[in-house]
UniProtKB/Swiss-Prot annotation:
This is Biotin synthase. Keywords: 2Fe-2S, 4Fe-4S, Biotin biosynthesis, Iron, Iron-sulfur, Metal-binding, S-adenosyl-L-methionine, Transferase. GO terms for molecular function: 2 iron, 2 sulfur cluster binding; 4 iron, 4 sulfur cluster binding; biotin synthase activity; iron ion binding. Pathway: Cofactor biosynthesis; biotin biosynthesis; biotin from 7,8-diaminononanoate: step 2/2. Residues 64-282 form the Radical SAM core domain. It comes from the Bacteria. Belongs to the radical SAM superfamily. Biotin synthase family. It catalyses: (4R,5S)-dethiobiotin + (sulfur carrier)-SH + 2 reduced [2Fe-2S]-[ferredoxin] + 2 S-adenosyl-L-methionine = (sulfur carrier)-H + biotin + 2 5'-deoxyadenosine + 2 L-methionine + 2 oxidized [2Fe-2S]-[ferredoxin]. Its cofactor is [4Fe-4S] cluster; [2Fe-2S] cluster.
Length: 354
């Protein structure tokens, strides 16, 4: 029988949680982060950096709490983009077979299972470069079905036009994911079918529609340390910065151009998590792809550095992820709670109670 978090969570006084609150954005940080300033943080002695990150984290978030989100590929493969890390590109021979958009019943069944296992946010990914309006209409039906289960919803569908973002907002979408992937200076080494500015434009359309932003990047694609600093600076300088910041460690999939990239030094990955926490104190910093290759000790350091969200479930789109039992056991060993918790700053509660 599969364990759930309720099996291992210590009893605590009930805290009323309101799932759906009016959309608001966190206040932008005073000033901007230069790449040099971010690099100086990354270069701090490791223990000093973790101490600073944990101090910032405790100023803004309850200690020991982690958001559980589940990610489902609702339309797999056949993408015309050439992102060098992605096994869903039609340009690469990775063994991924293109599949049509899942039905409402299929998605509802998956979302209900995720909710029953402890997830509070359900993310739906579709391998499109840019969805057509008829696709947006169908995804709207999926959003409504998932929200009917009492879960927060997130979608990642590719580039959006302003009217499409408005339609998703009208369907009840809470979050939209659109990653920057890396620093602008390194971006063309990773993908050539979409401009960096197009990513920024989609983020603007999402923000203007009143949808919360989920935006992060990938570490381990052959980038230099300065490019990691550049990515964090780009994210932190978005006005306002994203409510959710997923940090991925490259999963090297055979058949993709980046399959032979050198592995990321685990402590370097922890450093990126720590600097994301310091520069974006009220964001959910999410451990995303690559957790399966980290091990418990590295994940524990990431939580210490300020990560407070994970993708929960045995698959992320088409790549592996630790199974639910493994995550339940890890959180229990660390004395952490996988539950819905808000930022300790009252004006930010509506964004950070996923």
């Amino acid at each position: 029988m599969t364990a759930t978090l309720s099996d291992i969570r210590p009893e605590a006084p009930a805290v009323p949680v309101q799932l759906h609150r009016p959309a608001r954005t966190p206040a932008p940080a005073a000033g901007t982060w230069s790449v040099q300033a971010v690099q100086e943080l990354l270069d701090l002695p490791f223990m000093e950096l973790l101490w600073r990150a944990q101090s910032v984290h405790r100023e803004h978030w309850p200690a020991g709490d982690v958001e559980l989100a589940t990610l489902l590929s609702v339309k797999t493969g056949g993408c015309p983009e050439n992102c060098g890390y992605c096994p869903q590109s039609a340009e690469f021979d990775t063994g991924v077979k293109a599949q049509k958009l899942m039905s409402v019943d299929e998605v509802t069944t998956a979302a209900r299972a995720a909710r029953d296992a402890g997830a509070t946010r359900f993310c739906m990914g579709a391998a499109w470069r840019a969805p057509k309006d008829r696709d947006i209409e169908k995804v709207g039906e999926l959003i409504a079905a998932v929200k009917g289960l009492g879960m927060q919803t997130c979608a990642t569908l590719g580039m959006l036009e302003p009217h499409q973002a408005q339609a998703l907002k009208g369907a009840g979408l809470d979050y939209y994911n659109h990653n920057l992937d890396t620093a602008p200076e390194y971006y063309t080494d990773v993908v050539s079918t979409r401009a960096y500015q197009e990513r920024l434009d989609t983020l603007r359309h999402v923000r203007e529609a009143g949808i919360s932003v989920c935006c992060g990047g990938i570490i381990g694609m052959g980038e230099a340390p300065v490019h990691r600093a550049g990515l964090i600076a780009q994210l932190a300088n978005l006005d306002p910065y994203p409510e959710s910041v997923p940090i991925n460690s490259l999963v090297r999939v055979p058949g993709t151009p980046l399959a032979d990239s050198d592995p990321v030094d685990p402590l370097d990955f922890v450093r990126v998590i720590a600097v994301a926490r310091i520069t974006m104190p009220r964001a959910r910093v999410r451990l995303s792809a690559g957790r399966q290759q980290m091990g418990d000790a590295v994940q524990a350091l990431c939580f210490l550095a300020g990560a407070n969200s994970i993708f929960y479930g045995d698959k992320l789109l088409v790549t592996g992820n630790p199974d639910v039992d493994a995550d339940v056991q890890l959180l229990a060993k660390l004395g952490m709670n996988g539950r819905q918790v808000a930022s300790t700053e009252p004006h930010d509660l509506h964004h950070h109670a996923p």
